[in-house]
């Protein structure tokens, strides 16, 4: 499930693995595809073929997780990160996600076209106007309204 998430953080006692080959099956539900896209095909093959579990520090080192926190700091860190995302213009965050996801499925030139269209789409929003005005006026954004 975690490999389906945009951002993955864990506590320092987390353990990750793909044990399926030890059960005589392949990882399902996108496990082979998501892992390869996150950590690269070589590391994904090693993890899947050996069915070896890895600890949080190794998961961070190979790019499976974005950050590792002590257990008692995990939830506050997650809330802080969520608040940091939530304070930004929802339309812009959504367009960034779309640009990244769609761009990964295309060549660089096509991906840039996707990004340009989404970038331009932001200029039709109230949130862009408020964000740019606040920047130019050297003040905080009053509110992003998701429109």
Q: Which positions does each model-derived feature cover?
A:
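Crotonase-fold acyl-CoA enzyme core
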Residues: 1-91, 125, 130-133
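A short acidic, helix-capping loop that chelates divalent metal ions and anchors anionic groups
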Residues: 20, 102-105
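Helix-loop "lid/cap" segments that line or gate small-molecule binding pockets
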Residues: 47-48, 99, 103, 118-123
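Acidic catalytic patch
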Residues: 93-101, 133
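Short beta-strand->loop
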Residues: 107-112, 146
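Terminal low-complexity tails and localization/encapsulation signals of metabolic enzymes
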Residues: 133-147
């Amino acid at each position: 499930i975690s490999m389906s998430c945009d951002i993955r953080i864990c506590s320092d006692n987390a353990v990750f693995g793909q044990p399926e080959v030890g059960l005589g099956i392949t990882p399902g539900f996108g496990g082979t595809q998501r892992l390869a896209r996150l950590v690269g095909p070589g590391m994904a093959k090693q993890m899947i073929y050996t069915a070896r579990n890895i600890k949080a520090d190794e998961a961070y080192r190979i790019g499976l997780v974005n950050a590792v926190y002590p257990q008692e700091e995990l939830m506050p860190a997650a809330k802080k990160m969520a608040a940091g995302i939530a304070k930004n213009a929802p339309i812009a965050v959504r367009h960034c996600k779309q640009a990244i996801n769609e761009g990964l499925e295309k060549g660089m030139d096509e991906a840039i076209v996707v990004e340009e269209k989404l970038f331009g789409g932001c200029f039709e929003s109230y949130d862009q106007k408020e964000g740019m005005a606040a920047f130019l006026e050297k003040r905080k954004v009053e509110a992003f309204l998701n429109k």
